[in-house]
Structure formats: structure tokens, C-alpha cells
């Protein structure tokens, strides 16, 4: 892939005349022995892609809302693409607020459930001849072609209760910069003030604290049970 680094490729969805170009970059994250060795990056909706996007300073465009529906806000797709192209060409400066306000979901996909949108993308890519096709035989023995789909294991989070696929997304949260407060904990073990038993646990301890991530301290879950309380127009409480 070396000759392709620094070039651009087209995202094959949406009206042909408005399709967006994205850069082809290199990173140590992809496994060259897994699949093609090349991956797409969706920084706003994948933990690993987020880190890759940060390292390469790639804008992270959110495509879904909190209900798993493709976004419907923002300008028409052609206008958002023009703005994204200007950002790519370094014609305009950008920050997180600008990127968060932009909706790069093609107009025909807006408002669709995420799974509906996926099926529509596959159908349209296949119809346009952009999918890899393989020979297939139907139940009656007739030979045809179909889009090639590889079955590969991936790490996919599901909700414990809903059993529904969890989609990572960018939200505003409060974090503690833990890298600034771990030094005393590291020094306490290094100088012998704290002894880890068995001693082999020290390696795990050092690896954890030396690679610690910021700690998210804000929550969207309920703390405890909700108590049903009502107030009438006179201020009386009913529980």
C-alpha cells in the first residue's frame, strides 16, 4: 500500500457528484495479516479508530444520534461535503465545535435506523458495481453472482439487558487527568514503601500506571432508584 499513502479515495455513498474524498494514511494499528491489512477509520464511532484519528489529526464526524438513527440535522449533504472538502484542503480552520455541527450523512440516509442504513449502503454499492462479486448458486442450481462477504470475528459490544449492539459515539464528559496523579503510587512501589506480593505483580502494576488513560467521572446512569414525587399547584408533595 506504500504508493497509496498520501493519496485520496472516494467514499462510495451518496450522489456521485457530491461524493467526499478522504486521505489514505498509515498507522501501526491495522494488522497486516488480518484481511486486506487496510481498514477504514470512523473516529467518532469506534474506540480504536478514535485513537488513530487523534494521531493523524483527522476530523471526527458524528453520523448517528443517541437513538442509533442517522442524523437529520445540519445543512444539505452537498453543502456539508463542500465544507468538509475545504477543511481537507486546509482552506478553512476547524475545531471540535465546527466538526460536531456538521452532518456528513447523505440526504437519502438521514433519519434511517443504523441497521436500515447499513443494508441500503450495501445494496447501492452492489448495484453500482463497486462490491467484490463472486459466483453463487441458488436453490434451483442456477448460477449467478452475489456480493462477497467475508466472515471474520470482531470484538462487538452488546448491551447486557437490551442485547443490542452498542455504538460508541462522541459526547461531552468530565475527565480526571490521571497521568498527573500516579507518580506517588509508582514511587511508593519503586522505593519499597509498598510491597506487591507476588513480586511478579509489579510488572502488571507498572504497565497499568505507566499507560493509564484519563478517568471519566461523569455519568449518564441513574444513581440509585428514582423516587416518584409530584408537586401540585400549591406546592404540596405526593410520593
Where are these regions (language model features)?
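Short beta-strand-centered aromatic/proline hotspots
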Residues: 21-27
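Short coil-to-beta-strand transition motifs
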Residues: 16-20
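Residue patterns forming the tRNA-binding/recognition surfaces of aminoacyl-tRNA synthetases
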Residues: 6, 33-238
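Residues at the C-termini of beta-strands that transition into short coil/loop
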Residues: 13, 28, 64-67
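Short conserved beta-strand and strand-loop elements enriched in small hydrophobics
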Residues: 6-15
